[in-house]
Amino acid sequence: MKIAVLVKQVPGSESSLPINESNDWIDESSITYVMNPPDNFALEEALIIKEKIGSGEVVVVSMGPSRVQKVIREGLAKGADRGIHIQEDENIETDPLTISERFTEALKSENFDLILTGLQSDDTGMGQTGVLIGEMLGFSTATLVIETDLKQDKIRVKRELAVSYTHLRAHETY
């Protein structure tokens, strides 16, 4: 099974966010960046799935300037098999659709069986990228997943809802 894990580099929770001199963005030079914590959970789940089935490939995918290579290396250190860096030097905090289109373009040729993302990023918190990518690639999509169970060509996920849990099943391409 070939699993992609999308990871975003976000400002650490202890970082200050000073405004730059032109007052139109933050001064990124003083920020400590980390892997988005929800994406870290997705990476952990991908590694668990690979271990359970006994084979496969986990690929960490991130988009942004050269500094995002740090979170790709972190993913590799945790057990991912390889990383893909989608180079983007511009301010990519535009909109989820544009970001999703860039990811989809990079993911298409890889033929992943499963794509995992965190619930949302700790910086902008939009939570739309994974769902949009799923739609663009024609994948079944589930959000708020807290547990997975793979059997042959099917995946069963447990989703955490406001007051209960629900289970969903998907076939072949997850």
Region spans (language model):
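Short glycine/serine/threonine-rich phosphate/pyrophosphate-binding segments
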Residues: 14, 41-43, 68-70, 123-129
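Short beta-strand-loop elements within alpha/beta enzyme cores
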Residues: 110-121
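Single conserved hydrophobic/aromatic residue that forms the stacking wall/gate
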Residues: 167-170, 174
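N-terminal beta-strand-loop-alpha-helix module at the start
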Residues: 1-63
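Glycine/small-residue-rich loop that forms an oxyanion/phosphate-binding "nest" at active or ligand-binding sites
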Residues: 92-107
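A glycine-rich helix N-cap at a beta->alpha junction
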Residues: 71-95
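Anionic-ligand binding region
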Residues: 148, 154-165
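Short Gly/Thr/Asp-enriched flexible loops that form oxyanion-binding sites at enzyme active sites
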Residues: 124-137, 141
